């Protein structure tokens, strides 16, 4: 007997709750008897905890359909799973009251040279707890009947073709990174591609249970730029999640004896999920990261309605939190933050962390600018917001004063920002003196030993110098890069991309390419030996930034988009696109020139030159930093 088995399956991108499977069995030699068993199952174990977290109160089985509803034990979230088949089978004979698995059995005789195909169309969707599950599940069943495998396949193909037209990055001369960056782009689209205000981007995306699906402060910093230039609707959903969890952020602030809203450092539902107080209580970058996300969304979309409807409220509450978390120095009268932890988690309970203070100052000033804009452009909406939040003029005056008096430890002579008070006095441990077997330090050193050194886990000063790049001269950027880069051990997968981007800006081609070396293939090649736990989603987003913001030299923090492309000597050329306010910009870079065009007339800055693009491709000589 010789048998051919063909398995086809897909998860629909345009219809994001749908999936389909098709099994084709062909009897190549001899007659065969086959039995196929198709399941819907919630009988899965959390890998690290070895525990099942589902209850299944609803089951429905017919000769050509299955339905089951799962309710998560801890958070009581409802998930409906429904599927229909294009053939009739034998239902599960008996079910326990809370069975987590249902099935249909299909038995067939296939004659030699004959074939049998079984197709399933499935829907998996969230249900609000107070919705009528019977009504929702019945509607799901009726909805599935309008689709076929071929329809879903064709729609999926069209969706991906459209996405690659916008999102593709092409590298000539580096097949490994060509494959790697396309893998990264594919994963970013799979992770989030629709306007779902309840969606979060977990540290592992949808690919693993590590970090329990929680999103972290770096979502707005690393992931949002990708979506803003490739899928603005998905970008807005990231901010929607923060707006819809504003009540939880307010409760978190109260728990920390603060005003306003304190966004959690790790969350899946809006509530703080980090059980390490030194991270959960001391890190303010989740809140200032929300500010950065709103600011960048405003800058790159011009969506004033969203800003006025939702952004302003979040900014007011974040500013209230920062004003109550910070304090004035009794000796100098300057304002700053005490007992905090910045992005570099190797330094705890520090005073005047540079990133924290800088981002807080930006938050105060952006909030004030937005409220002034609302007062002029939408006075009625502004007054309604003021009344609803009981916003006082005195608060605005205080925020202005706090921003003006913010402590920023900058030395005009050395052009260095001190990462925090006393950082320059910390003992220096040379990285080459640490035995290889002691890495990662988090797993091999006592916490207090880590805190007693000037080593960095990931960039802190360099982080805000990337986010607000146009605020800093090349001399200041170079001084800080030269000082902090040798002290960073990159124990976060997010760290190399920041250094690569800034190295490219400074003309440090070897540094830029070396830091880029692991970016696109971290999970494909399992560099960190932990891909089995899930993909490094924010690092994958950083890989896209590494090419577009790094070698492409994109800067999106000014009035105009700015490009300063460079190219690794190992590459012949590369091409990427930017979807900016409805205009598609195409950028091609080779070893001699930069060629650009746009679907609509658009001004941008190329190196030091302001140019206007249109549909006709224009070429300019590449400039070496």
Where are these regions (language model features)?
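Active-site core of glycosidic bond-cleaving carbohydrate-active enzymes
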Residues: 215-243, 309, 365, 372, ...
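Helix-terminus loop motifs that line ligand-binding clefts
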Residues: 192-207, 233-292, 298, 305-307, ...
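Gly/Pro-rich turn-and-neighbor structural signature
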Residues: 167-199, 203, 357, 382-423
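Acidic/polar, glycine-enriched structural segments that form the non-catalytic walls/loops
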Residues: 1-211, 445-449
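Well-ordered alpha-helical scaffold segments within catalytic/enzyme domains
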Residues: 165-170, 187-190, 221-232, 278, ...
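The feature captures the catalytic groove of carbohydrate-active enzymes
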Residues: 207-215, 261-309, 320-400, 594
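Alpha-helical scaffold segments in carbohydrate-active enzymes
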Residues: 183-190, 241-248, 313-325, 362, ...
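Non-catalytic C-terminal accessory modules of carbohydrate-active enzymes
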Residues: 1-4, 473-478, 485, 502-625
């Amino acid at each position: 007997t010789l048998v051919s088995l063909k398995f086809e399956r897909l998860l629909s991108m345009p219809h994001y709750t749908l999936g389909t499977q098709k099994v084709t069995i062909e009897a190549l030699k001899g007659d065969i008897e086959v039995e196929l068993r198709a399941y819907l199952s919630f009988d899965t174990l959390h890998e690290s905890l070895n525990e099942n977290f589902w209850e299944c109160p609803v089951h429905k089985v017919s000769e050509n359909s299955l339905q089951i509803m799962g309710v998560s034990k801890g958070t009581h979230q409802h998930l409906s799973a429904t599927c229909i088949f294009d053939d009739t089978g034998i239902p599960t004979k008996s079910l326990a009251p809370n069975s987590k698995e249902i099935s249909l059995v299909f038995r067939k005789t296939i004659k030699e040279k004959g074939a049998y195909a079984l197709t399933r169309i499935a829907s998996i969707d969230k249900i609000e707890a107070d919705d009528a599950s019977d009504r929702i599940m019945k509607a799901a069943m009726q909805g599935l009947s309008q689709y076929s495998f071929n329809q879903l396949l064709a729609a999926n193909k069209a969706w991906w073709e459209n996405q690659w037209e916008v999102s593709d990055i092409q590298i000539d001369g580096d097949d490994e990174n060509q494959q790697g960056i396309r893998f990264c782009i594919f994963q970013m689209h799979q992770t989030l591609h629709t306007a779902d205000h309840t969606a979060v981007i977990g540290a592992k995306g949808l690919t693993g249970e590590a970090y329990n699906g929680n999103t972290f402060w770096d979502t707005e910093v690393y992931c949002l730029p990708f979506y803003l230039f490739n899928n603005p609707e998905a970008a807005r959903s990231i901010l929607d999640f923060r707006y819809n969890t504003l009540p939880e952020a307010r409760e978190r602030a109260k728990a920390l004896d603060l005003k306003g809203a304190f966004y959690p450092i790790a969350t899946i539902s809006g509530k703080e999920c980090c059980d390490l107080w030194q991270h959960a209580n001391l890190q303010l970058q989740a809140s200032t990261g929300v500010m950065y996300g709103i600011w960048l969304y405003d800058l790159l979309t011009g969506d004033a309605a969203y800003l006025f409807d939702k952004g302003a409220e979040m900014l007011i509450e974040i500013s209230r939190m920062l004003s109550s978390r910070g304090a004035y120095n009794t000796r100098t009268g300057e304002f700053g933050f005490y007992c905090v932890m910045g992005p570099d988690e190797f330094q705890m309970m520090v005073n005047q962390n540079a990133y924290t203070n800088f981002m807080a100052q930006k938050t105060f000033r952006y909030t004030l600018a937005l409220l002034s804009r609302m007062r002029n452009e939408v006075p009625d909406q502004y007054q309604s917001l003021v009344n609803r939040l009981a916003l006082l003029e005195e608060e605005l005056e205080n925020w202005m004063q706090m921003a003006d008096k913010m402590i920023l430890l900058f030395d005009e002579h050395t052009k260095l920002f001190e990462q925090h008070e006393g950082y320059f006095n910390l003992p220096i441990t040379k990285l080459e003196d640490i035995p290889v077997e002691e890495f990662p330090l988090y797993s091999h050193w006592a916490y207090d030993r880590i805190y007693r050194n000037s080593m960095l886990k990931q960039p802190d000063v360099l982080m805000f110098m990337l986010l607000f790049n146009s605020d800093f001269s090349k001399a200041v950027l170079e001084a800080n890069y030269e000082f902090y880069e040798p002290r960073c051990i990159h124990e976060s997968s997010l760290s190399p991309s920041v250094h690569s981007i800034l190295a490219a800006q400074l003309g440090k081609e070897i540094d830029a390419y070396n830091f880029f070396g692991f970016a696109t293939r971290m999970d494909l090649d399992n560099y960190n030996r932990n891909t089995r736990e899930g993909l490094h989603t924010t690092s994958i987003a950083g890989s896209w930034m590494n090419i577009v913001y790094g070698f492409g030299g994109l800067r999106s923090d000014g009035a105009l988009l700015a490009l300063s492309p460079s190219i690794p000597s190992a590459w012949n050329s590369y091409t990427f696109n930017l979807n900016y306010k409805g205009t598609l910009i195409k950028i091609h870079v080779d070893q001699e020139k930069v060629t650009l065009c746009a679907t609509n007339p658009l001004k941008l800055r190329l190196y030091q030159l302001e140019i206007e693009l249109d549909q006709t491709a224009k070429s300019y000589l590449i400039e070496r930093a």
